[in-house]
Design a protein with these regions (language model features):
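Glycine-centered loop/turn motifs
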Residues: 5-6, 109
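Active-site HxH/HxHxD metal-binding segment of metal-dependent hydrolases
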Residues: 26, 47-123
Length: 125
């Protein structure tokens, strides 16, 4: 397996960024981690790729803070619930989706922190 991609970014210290792809659904999943703290987030997890994603998170020693769904998915089944069960991470999704079992219902302007970094929620049409 290739070494993690590290990039200097706002917030200080290296940022781990991994782009993962599920060919069956055409879905990109993103793993971001604040390297100094070891905390990270997973964005748009795919149900069928849970084992791959969990293996990578464990291999890199990341403490997963949240599994974030950018929208309610018609193109694939989310893997966020499985990731929550495996790691205890929060499940984050737009409050307007009306989904149950979401621990972080998100609205425009919310922030999701991991280590010394944060993502800002931007509602889009």
């Amino acid at each position: 397996m290739a070494a993690p991609l590290l990039a200097a970014a706002a917030g200080g210290g290296p940022l781990l960024f991994r782009q993962l792809f599920d060919a069956n659904t055409g879905t990109f999943t993103y793993l971001l981690a604040d390297v100094p703290s070891g905390q990270g987030v997973l964005i748009d997890a795919v149900f069928e790729q849970h084992a791959r994603d969990l293996s990578l998170i464990r291999e890199l020693g990341i403490e997963l803070v949240a599994s974030i769904d950018t929208h309610a998915h018609a193109d694939h089944v989310t893997g966020s619930w499985l990731m929550h069960e495996a790691t205890g991470c929060a499940i984050a999704l737009a409050a307007t989706a009306g989904a149950t079992n979401v621990s972080r219902p998100l609205v425009h302007g919310d922030h999701i922190g991991f280590g010394r970094r944060q993502l800002e929620v931007r509602a889009t049409p």
